[in-house]
UniProtKB/Swiss-Prot annotation:
Keywords: Proteasome, Repeat. The lineage of its organism: Eukaryota, Metazoa, Ecdysozoa, Arthropoda, Hexapoda. This is 26S proteasome non-ATPase regulatory subunit 4. The 26S proteasome is composed of a core protease, known as the 20S proteasome, capped at one or both ends by the 19S regulatory complex (RC). The RC is composed of at least 18 different subunits in two subcomplexes, the base and the lid, which form the portions proximal and distal to the 20S proteolytic core, respectively. Interacts with Ubc4. Residues 249-262 have a biased composition (Gly residues). PROSITE patterns: UIM. Residues 212-231, 276-295, 303-322 form the UIM domain. Residues 263-278 have a biased composition (Low complexity).
């Protein structure tokens, strides 16, 4: 495994707004940078990758690091603007590589070019010769079919490699092609031995991610796919009315039943079982969220007496069992005598002149000092005195 520090140059000029590479050049370039970054970091755990932009004033977004998340977060903040400045970008990338921490790392620059180059071929060739002396390899990904770009870039790569060198590469991606697929089969990913991109293809691991190397990313992708599947199933259930037969089911008549094989029967049984479990789950959720509205009275239409009676009934239902057993143990004579005592108490209260006087004072529109009220209260006092005299004579 080769120890290598790599600077990736991101073309973010206004030409990256074009949609000739679906959905836009900028987005497919991000996919290609993701692929290159993961390839370099997985080939050796000590490798480092940096990121910089090429438009207008060249900017270094991330210095050399082994944290792929940092590269991805910086890359997604890039917006297209201005024109590409390829020559300045390559010089600054070389300066960043010269200040790498691992001096035993080989130096490599990966440049994405999707804009017309405004530099002369001679200037780029001179820069290529300087990079060759410093033992810096450059890989260029050219896309967009801009005039003489390929001729200028080919001369640049040939000056880097010399007669026998093969360390630098040029990959041209024509319109209509997928940039990441072209990179997968290129020497930039595969390497000189053709084994650099092992494990990055979508057919090797699920979602194109090795769970042994990045278990968190693999788990996140798996959970995301499961949530998407559940969301699609719920949308299909909402689209189909309740009780409607599934498409292509029993609507085919008897011929469809006779022609179905064991596999179809097993799939139909599995679907019925899933539907049954789903129905039971929905029923349980409905029961758990259901409120007993039918058992609750309408307090708005109840009188005060009805509300008091309902409150007393609820308090009796909430009372402990001991009070119920104590009431059951009471003799029947007490129950028979209780209403009489209540009646006697009520008669005594009604016949109390002081109580009547207080009630009359609180009644609206009643003058307790009027002659009629005084006569009524006085008659009650006379009746009370007569009753008390009669009781005293009976006792004697």
């Amino acid at each position: 495994m080769v120890l290598e520090s790599t600077m990736i140059c991101f073309d973010n000029s206004d030409f990256q707004r074009n949609g000739d590479y679906f959905p836009t050049r900028l987005i497919v370039q991000r996919d290609g940078i993701n692929l290159v970054c993961l390839t370099k970091l997985r080939s050796n755990p000590e490798n480092n990758v940096g990121l910089m932009t090429l438009s207008n004033t060249v900017e270094v977004l991330a210095t050399l690091t082994s944290d792929a998340g940092r590269i991805f977060s910086k890359m997604h903040l890039v917006q297209p603007k201005g024109e590409i400045n390829l020559l300045t970008g390559i010089r600054i990338a070389h300066l960043v590589l010269k200040h790498r921490q691992g001096k035993n790392h080989k130096m490599r620059i990966v440049v994405f070019v999707g804009s017309p180059i405004n530099h002369e071929e001679g200037d780029l060739v001179k820069q290529a010769k300087r990079l060759k002396k410093e033992k810096v390899n450059v890989d260029i990904v050219s896309f967009g079919d801009h005039g003489n770009n390929n001729e200028i870039l080919t001369a640049f790569i040939n000056a880097l490699n010399g007669k026998d060198g093969t360390g630098s590469h040029l990959v041209s991606v024509p319109r209509g092609s997928v940039l990441s697929d072209a990179l997968l089969s290129s020497p930039i990913i595969q390497g000189e031995d053709g084994m650099g991109g092992a494990g990055l293809g979508g057919n090797v691991f699920e979602f194109g991610v090795d769970p042994n190397e990045d278990p968190e990313l693999a788990l996140a992708l798996r959970v995301s796919m499961e949530e998407q599947r559940q969301r699609q199933e719920s949308e299909q259930r909402r689209a189909n009315p309740d009780g409607a037969p599934p498409t292509g089911g029993d609507a085919g008549g008897g011929g469809g039943v006779s022609g179905s094989g064991p596999g179809n029967e097993e799939s139909a049984g599995a679907e019925n079982e899933a539907n049954t479990e789903e129905a039971m789950l929905q029923r349980a959720l409905a029961l758990s969220t259901e409120t007993p509205e039918d058992n609750l009275p309408d307090f708005a239409n109840m009188t005060e007496e009805e509300q008091i009676a309902f409150a007393m009934q609820m308090s009796m239902q909430d009372a402990p069992d001991d009070s119920v057993t104590q009431q059951a143990k009471r003799p029947k004579t007490d129950e028979a005598n209780a209403p009489m005592d209540v009646d006697e108490d009520y008669s005594e209260v009604i016949g109390d002149p002081a109580f009547l006087q207080s009630v009359l004072e609180n009644l609206p529109g009643v003058d307790p000092q009027s002659e009629a009220v005084r006569d009524a209260v006085g008659s009650l006092n006379k009746d009370k005195d007569k009753k008390s005299d009669g009781k005293d004579s009976q006792k004697k």
